[in-house]
């Protein structure tokens, strides 16, 4: 053993302490995953070495075969995992093994619930595989040297997984990392060749470099123990390069867990090889659950990029649009250069062609999932629906395809579940209906009881109910689907087209003529509060509503702009009244202009509240209402 120098004891970052505690308690039921996680890290270290050695061949230090070795010592109760990858310097070890230098750490910690299954998913997703060693070990030692550093700059890290760790400088002849797990009492099962072999076959068969175990060889009686020989126990070939027919579902699932750092199986995947003008292979996965940082724009996203089976980068963002940022996978190109950079990726026309094809492949995969596994698609929509709604604005070429994948709540159901596709809606449309009607609002309770829906209920016309914050913005980009245009039922002067009979239209015009005087009186009373007053075609039960001008921003968009501190363009609502409602008839007969004004303002404020808006002067509303109540009680 080499002499240790510059030895120091350091404390773990607070988050690491919490994480170690959670690791040991949340993942205990599936403790064998520690080996999968450590092998996955070792594989990444070898990938990084391969890539760095393209420009600095001297890092290979003589060019021994790249591999991972797993060994054990029954007597000492240890399991050792060794790779000859990129290795770590003293600084790397302190940074990577003592702290979690990741954005989103606080969010991650907040999301932990104490529920074992949910937490294990989050922990895996956060990519903290090294700490899983403490599930089975009460002490972990790491011996490492970064490729390119002298042998005298090796490092030894050691911890019992409590509050601190020790780090020292050592001599280490070979580059790479060796991890020694000192097994806890009762975990001796892992110091066994057969058990380790089974775990490797189960979880890490897809790893594209050899994973070796010592050959089991017993000495004959009276003979010396044979020299240690190693044998490869995994396939050691890149999964995406193999024919689809040879790959089992379980292999696809384990590969997903390796690249996505997820503990759950994916919902779906698509494996494809393209030959011809462009040559590349892709393996794309739809996760079962959303990552905790899905809405953080700076969160890592993108595919693993390989060029001719050599790893080039993680999180290559240029191959898929932002609204598909949740997709995990691998793309392996024969056409790109090995020294490709992120900047080059953003400008390369080859990438544009690949992005277009990969985007279509993902959308096809989602269409298939929606058609063949509607229950699974429901789960997908709950997790990723809001992100998919970013699609029509970002990806004009696939707008119709994305629209077909969207799901909405509607007046057809009464639970607010977003399970209606646009194809479902059109299949149920009334004869002669050439529009898709929708209403946006802050909550399902608010929109489903909106007075704007009264005429639609009366005529049995389905209306989509949109309550996500992104919905009004989405609909500004979604103009039509399958040749049918979208109509906001709260906007402009509602025209039901063929769904209104000529008699109904004529009768409405006659009523509007007879109420011209009332229209003028209300307009005078409400003054600058409104842009227009008119007789409503939408109402059957309520006395009045506020409609939005054809070119004006809706309530949702106004609130989003206000919340972000942006200037909101001035706009005034249109006041529509129901001429047959008893309150409007009373208003029409009111002789006192003062009382007429009070009643008009009360109706206006009530219509604003029904639309989900806040009152500009709540005190004035209360004063008028109290005055009216006093008059009624006399």
UniProtKB/Swiss-Prot annotation:
It is found in: Cytoplasm. Residues 560-634 are annotated as: C. Keywords: ATP-binding, Chaperone, Cytoplasm, Nucleotide-binding, Stress response. The keyword Cytoplasm applies. GO terms for cellular component: cytoplasm. SMART domains: HATPase_c (SM00387). Coiled coil: none annotated. Its main location: cytoplasm. Transmembrane segments: none annotated. Residues 1-342 are annotated as: A. The keyword Nucleotide-binding applies. GO terms for molecular function: ATP binding; ATP hydrolysis activity; ATP-dependent protein folding chaperone; unfolded protein binding. It comes from the Bacteria. Residues 343-559 are annotated as: B. Homodimer. Molecular chaperone. Has ATPase activity. Belongs to the heat shock protein 90 family. This is Chaperone protein HtpG. The gene is htpG.
């Amino acid at each position: 053993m080499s002499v240790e120098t510059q030895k120091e004891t350091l404390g773990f970052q607070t988050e690491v302490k919490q994480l170690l505690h959670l690791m040991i308690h949340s993942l205990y039921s599936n403790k064998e995953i520690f080996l999968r996680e450590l092998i996955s890290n070792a594989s990444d270290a070898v990938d990084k070495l391969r890539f760095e050695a393209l420009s600095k061949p001297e890092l290979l230090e003589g060019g021994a075969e790249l591999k991972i070795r797993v060994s054990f010592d029954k007597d000492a109760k240890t399991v050792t995992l060794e790779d000859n990858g990129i290795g770590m310097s003293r600084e790397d070890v302190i940074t990577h093994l003592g702290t979690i230098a990741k954005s989103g750490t606080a969010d991650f910690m907040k999301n932990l619930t104490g529920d074992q299954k949910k937490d294990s998913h989050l922990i895996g997703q956060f990519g903290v595989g090294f700490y899983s060693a403490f599930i089975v070990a009460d002490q972990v030692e790491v011996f490492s040297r970064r490729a390119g550093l002298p042998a005298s700059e090796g490092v030894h890290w050691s911890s019992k997984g409590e509050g601190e760790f020790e780090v020292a400088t050592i001599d280490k002849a070979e580059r790479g990392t060796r991890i020694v797990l000192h097994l806890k009492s009762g975990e001796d099962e892992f110091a066994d060749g057969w058990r380790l072999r089974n775990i490797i076959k189960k979880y890490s068969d897809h790893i594209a470099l050899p994973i070796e175990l010592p050959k089991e060889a017993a000495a004959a009686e009276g003979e010396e123990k044979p020299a240690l020989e190693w044998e490869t126990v995994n396939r050691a070939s890149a999964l995406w390069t193999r024919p689809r027919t040879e790959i089992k579902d379980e292999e696809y699932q384990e590969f997903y867990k390796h690249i996505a750092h997820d503990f759950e199986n994916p919902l779906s995947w698509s494996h494809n090889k393209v030959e011809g003008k462009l040559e590349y292979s892709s393996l794309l996965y739809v996760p079962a659950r959303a990552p905790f940082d899905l809405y953080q724009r700076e969160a890592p996203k993108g595919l693993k990029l390989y060029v001719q089976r050599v790893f080039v980068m993680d999180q290559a963002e240029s191959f898929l649009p932002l609204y598909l940022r949740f997709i995990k996978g691998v793309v392996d190109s024969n056409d790109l250069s090995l020294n490709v950079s992120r900047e080059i990726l953003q400008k390369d026309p080859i990438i544009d062609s690949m992005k277009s094809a990969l985007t279509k492949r993902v959308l096809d995969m989602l269409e298939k999932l929606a058609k063949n596994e509607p229950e699974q698609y429901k789960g997908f929509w709950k997790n990723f629906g809001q992100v998919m709604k970013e699609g029509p604005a970002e990806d004009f070429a696939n707008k119709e395809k994305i629209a077909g994948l969207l799901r909405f709540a509607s007046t057809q159901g009464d639970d607010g579940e977003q399970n209606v596709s646009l194809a479902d809606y059109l299949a149920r449309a009334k004869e002669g209906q050439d529009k898709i009607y929708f209403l946006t609002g802050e909550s399902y309770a608010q929109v489903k009881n909106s007075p704007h829906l009264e005429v639609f209920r009366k005529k049995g016309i389905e209306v989509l109910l949109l309550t996500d914050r992104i919905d009004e913005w989405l609909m500004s980009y979604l103009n039509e689907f399958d040749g049918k245009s979208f109509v906001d039922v709260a906007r402009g002067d509602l025209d039901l087209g063929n769904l209104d009979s000529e008699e109904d239209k004529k009768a409405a015009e006659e009523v509007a003529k007879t109420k011209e005087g009332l229209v003028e009186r209300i307009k005078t009373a409400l003054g600058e509060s409104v842009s227009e007053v008119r007789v409503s075609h939408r109402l059957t039960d309520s006395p009045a509503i506020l409609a939005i001008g054809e070119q004006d921003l809706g309530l949702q968009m106004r609130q989003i702009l206000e919340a972000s501190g942006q200037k909101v363009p001035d706009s005034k609502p249109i006041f529509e009244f129901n001429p047959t409602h008893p309150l409007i008839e009373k208003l029409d007969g009111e002789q006192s202009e003062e009382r007429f004004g009070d009643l008009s303002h009360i109706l206006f404020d009530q219509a604003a509240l029904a639309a989900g808006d806040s009152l500009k002067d709540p005190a004035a509303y209360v004063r008028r209402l109290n005055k009216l109540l006093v008059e009624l009680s006399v």
